[in-house]
Amino acid sequence: MAALMTRRFAQIPEITKLMEECQSMGIKTLGPDVNESYRVFGVNEHGEIRFGLSAIKGMGAPAADAIVAERLKNGPYKSIFDFAERVDYSSVNRKAFETLALSGGFDSFGIRREQFFGKNNKGETFLDTLVRYGQLFQQEQHEAANSLFGGTEAIEIATPPIPDAESWSTIERLNRERELVGIYLSAHPLDEYSIILNSLCNTHCSELGDKQELAKKEDVVLGGIITGVRSKFTKTGKPCGFVTLEDFEGSGELALFGEDWGKWRGIM
């Protein structure tokens, strides 16, 4: 499955379907991690699929390759500051740092994602000061190596403080993650409702397109989170809507017409 994802890593919708299939089969799919992910999708020692760095939306292959190459050459990144000190800035820019922070690529360092966007008393985000710190560290390191003393002294530059930041809501954090990796990986917005959904629902959202199976049921009960709404008009010019619902097993689309669409469109 990891190999199939790799072949389609440029097709986010296809990857999303494959990851949903993995989840339904009980195969754990983990988000990106700078200390375990490779450029493409892979399988870790526990048999879990690890998201490939270059499959993150907005993360280029050169940045992914540079991160992995440095890790393989000099060992795992010990902290976010160690990462900033070692990464190749000719390939890994600020946008790559931001993408990794939002997608969970830095989660293993124990820093909450929102803290990367917290500001100091100068109005600078931790993300900006972190990148600047790393670039300055490497500049000083280069100058020391080319000095008369041969760079024998350790580089001493103060690391930027990690700010406190107001916690994002679970849905905000997960939505930002989903925008970049195509699926909820670290958690699911419906986790706290899992017992209710499993007890009451007899249909998964992914089954909405199977009209024959739905017709066999006396009642159709399902639950999920709305992830998309499209407004359209019928051939006769009447308004209608198509709502994308997602649960733990996948997603499906529900069509609403007439009074139903008029009743619900204002709150979706």
What are these regions (language model features)?
Residues M1-M268:
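Noncatalytic, beta-rich nucleic-acid-contacting surfaces in large DNA/RNA-processing enzymes
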